[in-house]
Amino acid sequence: MKIIDICKYIISLGLIYILSINYGKDIINTIKLVNIDYIILIIFISLIQYILSAYRWKYISKYTNLNISFINSIKYYYISTFMNNILPGGIMGDIFRIYHHVDDKKEIFRIGRSFQSVVYERLSGQLMLLSFFILSLGLYFIIHQKYIAFSYLFLPLIAIFYFLKYIFNNNLRKYIKSKHYGNNFLTIFTGEVFWRHTVLSFFVMMSYIFIYIISAVSLGVNIDYFSFLVFTPIILFSMTLPVSIGGWGVREFAALLISFLLGLSASVSISVAIMYGILNLICSLPGLYFLLKLKSR
């Protein structure tokens, strides 16, 4: 195990330890209140989430000239998510997906069909996460009449958008086209193909947010649903940072910071994040089954 991976375990365990010292007793008391009926609902929503995510990967893969069956896309997506939940960095599962679909195992990180399919699929989800957060935060500012904050958010974003559009149309498009992966990238992230996988990413993102909100409801927490809709993407984004194990510790610390904006007690907000993490791991357990079945061949 590399030193950087050990550091990620230390970060996750260290942050959880710090939070448990300060809020441990209250967190345990809150989690004890969980309503199992909501857990069943979360598992059902998660199943739909995996099906949509796997189909998004299959759909994008078609435009990288990689043919993946729908059954295999579901199986490997479960495996990938399970591995991302327990291994450092949050990308080991994606590397596993690439490895098992790459033509030459020695060239796993070459920008080939398998590499492109996984990276572009992840990029589609991350773009939706970012877009959802920006739009929902803007709506939050308008509803709460925070017009100055709204202008500080959107005026720079508009300027950045047109600047990037200018760069893309004049230089970047030509550069991308000159690369062997360029046509695939432009096909996937422009036109009808882009909007189709973007719609899939929207519903996948909504499922993540619904699961987080239901995790809070399952603990009997009285929440402002719209505020949760706005700030949950921040917590989800924190989980994608490659500095921990499956987002553990970082997610809970982000929830602590968000608690001040949501008007929740710190222990309740952290409890919701922990419950979400536990449920996220439970929902990915079919990946362990598929992985063991794969290893037994």
Describe each model-derived feature in a short phrase.
Residues 1-78, 138-240, 271-297:
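Predominantly cytoplasmic-facing regulatory/coupling regions of multi-pass membrane proteins
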Residues 71-75, 93-94, 107-120, 264-275:
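Membrane-interface alpha-helices at helix entry/exit sites of multi-pass transporters
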Residues 74-105:
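Extended non-transmembrane interhelical loops and adjacent amphipathic helices
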Residues 131-142, 261:
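Transmembrane alpha-helix termini and helix-breaking/packing motifs in multi-pass membrane transporters
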Residues 62, 85, 103, 217, ...:
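Transmembrane helix-loop junction
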Residues 51-56, 89-98, 240-255:
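Transmembrane helix boundary and interhelical junction motifs in multipass membrane proteins
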Residues 101-109, 253-268:
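Interfacial segments of multi-pass membrane proteins
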Residues 79, 83-87, 112-134, 271-286:
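Membrane-embedded alpha-helical segments of transport systems
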